[in-house]
Amino acid sequence: MNSDTNAFKDIRISCVELSRIAFLPTESFDPNSLTLLACLKKVEEKLSAYEDDSLSPKFADYVFVPIASLLKQPALGESQTEYVLLIIFHLLRTCWSSNGKFSEQLGQQLFPLITFLVSSDKDNQKLITRSDEFKYAGCLVLHQFFKSVRSQRYHKEFFSNSKPNLLPALGHSVTILLKILEQSPQNNELQFKALASLEVLFQDIISDGEMLSFILPGNVSVFAKILTKPGRQIHYKVCVRTLEVLAKLLVLVYDDFSLDIKVNKLTDIRELSDTKLKHEINQSFMFNGPIVLLRTDGKTHRDTSWLTATSGQINIALEAFIPKLLKRNNESIDEALATFVSILLTRCENSLNNCEKVLVSTLVHLERDPMSKLPSHLVKLKEVVNEDLHKLSDIIRFENADRLSSLSFAITILEKNNERDTMINEVVRCLFESLNESIEPPSLINHKERIIEQSSQLTTTVNFENLESTNALIALPRLSEDMSLKLKKFTYHMGSLLLERHILNDVVTELISEQVDSPRTQKIVALWLSTNFIKAMEKQPKEEEVYLQFESDANYSSSMVEEVCLIVLEFCNELSQDISMEIEGKGIKKSDEFAVCTVLFSIETICAVMREEFQPELIDYIYTVVDALASPSEAIRYVSQSCALRIADTLYHGSIPNMILSNVDYLVESISSRLNSGMTERVSQILMVICQLAGYETIENFKDVIETIFKLLDYYHGYSDLCLQFFQLFKIIILEMKKKYINDDEMILKIANQHISQSTFSPWGMTDFQQVLNILDKETQVKDDITDENDVDFLKDDNEPSNFQEYFDSKLREPDSDDDEEEREEEVEGSSKEYTDQWTSPIPSDSYKILLQILGYGERLLTHPSKRLRVQILIVMRLIFPLLSTQHNLLIREVASTWDSIIQCVLCSDYSIVQPACSCVEQMIKYSGDFVAKRFIELWQKLCQDSFILKELRIDPTVHNHEKKSISKHVKFPPVTENALVSMVHMVLEGVKITEYLISEAVLEQIIYCCIQVVPVEKISSMSLIVGDIVWKIRNIN
């Protein structure tokens, strides 16, 4: 009471002011009066401050007096009506909300009034034009009215058939809320309040399916419209709330228990003679499907005819909005939809029997079954699976990955409930056929662009460190990686089902055996499927599961694994040989790429499954794996790396080199047989990969193969591509040989320095002052004894000169390039015997001989018209000379024999050849020392007369306008020219180191002048004192 008193005192003045306007005569009353609006706002503001159920009904009676007077006026403005509705809402909230405070009579009087104030016309046309604030006020008052009625004891009978006078207002209120829900897509709060009002009305007040059945169609229609709208128009939370309200409405109307439904199934054709059944059979039902009968008294609205008609409408509505909701791919919507469907399958299983398919299909597509309802609907689930299987080709072609995942989910449910006897075999058949249809036929692939051979740097570089993991994904032709991954997971799951049923062996054997005369594409698909089936065996049983295995099961499993793996391996071997023969000399097509990747994937999987038992089988497949490592296809290389790592991890403790070395004999045999059969393509790349992976040790096992390659160079030296591949291989061999026998370049220089004079003051091979004294002593002794002809000559070495001139002349008489080819071959053959006692090179004589052979064939092919081949040969020669310098006696012979051929390349007009040729000559000068001093002097003369590259520079140091800055480059050269000039300058400067005291100052000045136009002056002037003086002279005197 105290609250009422305080509230009365607080609101009395506002009510008085409102009454003054409300009780005005009709002719004086202004329905749109702003004063009236202000008074209503004051009252509403006062009421909004009071807590729920804090005041008595008497207080409401007092406040309602001016409101009742207002309602007697002929009209009321929109804003004024809005605040009247808000005032009624507050009165319901504060005074009429709890049990016993809101009389049934008052409710019956107030409800029609509220619905009229919200919408005065039955069609709600005016309501559409109202503001959202007005609509919200209407929803608020209706929601609060329903809540207040719910709190009263009479709430169950408030809208009963015994009180028909309220039914029109009830129908009107429902249409108002549905109209607001449908027409306010941008106002979520308004929609939530409308849905909350309907929920209270349906579930807590009416809760009578019979009565709700009258208003069901309109509700379902509006709800379906809401749920079918796109996401940009309807918030996902509104969809979730709508599904909740719709589920409650459908359960109230179609609940199997309340309808007292009895389900009969036809078991005998004679049952059709039953009169009742004749009447109930409807064409929309399957002939052998369930026929629903209702026990009715003839007075109820919900009879069989009603059920047949309305359930069909419900099915149409479900088929309309469920696919739209699925496409939104929203987690909250998916969860609400799964709950919605599960509730209908639980409470309305029989009454909405015709909706069973769409409901089951929804759970399958959602891959959710929160109430575990699918096991009780296996027949319909199987129909859904069969339909998806028949559409599997389209699912794959259009890359509907989600549909494939849901199919796997459905098959799992069937498998868990012993409904897989024929289903799993049907799945395998459809999967095989669908993949074949989805992958492009070979006739269309043949005209596709072939995979272009990449540079040797790419195709022969195998980087296992960058491989994130094994089990590389094989993308199916014409399908994305995502879809390929989904298919792989799907197939793997089917394999696990086959394994559980112990029929994996039979299915794989049958699948492969049927492909004997099939096109290669089908064979590859069969192999891809079989391998993914077998991959299920790779999963090891958990430790606790091992104890549950019976011995017979374990033995069967072991024998089954080995048998099916061997079948797949044999199939891989046949396919691999066919592919190798087909692509030899033709290049790899995209279809070949997928085929090779699948074979490698199969080998990797079998290795993972068989583990140590795969060791005896490896010899037949190691060449296939290594061959793929050298493939021009990046995809094939990636998969082969994954396969090689798997084999190494399983059998060789993760060591790729050990894997290669342990099987090198089989690799030699495979490569030799291919060479002998004329299959020369890519042999060099394979050897490169082997050498890179396992080091030079493998080449020692490939000596016969290397000899065969040398013979092929004799026979096929006109084929530039083949020769180029061989010299790319030679480069790898040389690098690996250096890696094994030579620690670093300093080691080579240390060995070479024993024979090379590095001091400019000892050009005749003398390295210290004592050698000078010894020479002088011997010459003096000869002069003292020259008159005594009977004296015995002084003891000296036969090979040691008696004076400077003889020593210098002996150097010039050493072997040079006039030696013919036959002498070279004899020297190569006899080198190991002749120098056995004095062999100083860390490189064994057999390996050294390989270097000499490579050098000899390279010199011969330097006249080949192919520019790429000549460049590659020069690159290889540049690598050879430092290694040859470790045995100086043989180095000088090779320098002498190859000098002229390489100099011809230096004088070439093609600068891309000049650059490696100059680098090669630089190495020859560096490691031969004063042996090539005379040749270098002659070379400079040739350069001045015949060189094209030297013409890019100014040779005469006296013509530069006496400007220091003119010494630098007078033109900006293209990259090719620039590289060639730099290489030539380095070559010339290396020659200057051994000839600066043998050539005239004018020539030396000419050489230095050319060099400082290309490389920094500081680098040249720091070479020696003489060179520094020449640089100073050029810059300051000329």
Curated annotation (Swiss-Prot):
It comes from the Eukaryota. This is TEL2-interacting protein 1. It comes from Saccharomyces cerevisiae (strain ATCC 204508 / S288c) (Baker's yeast). Component of the ASTRA chromatin remodeling machinery complex composed of at least RVB1, RVB2, TRA1, TEL2, TT1 and TTI2. Component of the TTT complex composed of TEL2, TTI1 and TTI2. Interacts with TEL2 and TTI2. Belongs to the tti1 family. Component of the ASTRA complex involved in chromatin remodeling. GO terms for cellular component: cytoplasm; mitochondrion; nucleus; TTT Hsp90 cochaperone complex. InterPro entries: ARM-type_fold, TELO2-interacting_protein_1, Tti1, TTI1_rpt. It holds the Pfam family TTI1. The modification Phosphoserine is found at S817. Residues 810-840 are annotated as: Disordered. It is found in: Cytoplasm; Nucleus. One of its GO terms (biological process) is chromatin organization. Residues 816-829 have a biased composition (Acidic residues). PANTHER family: TEL2 INTERACTING PROTEIN 1 TTI1 FAMILY MEMBER, TELO2-INTERACTING PROTEIN 1 HOMOLOG. Present with 721 molecules/cell in log phase SD medium. Keywords: Chromatin regulator, Cytoplasm, Nucleus, Phosphoprotein.
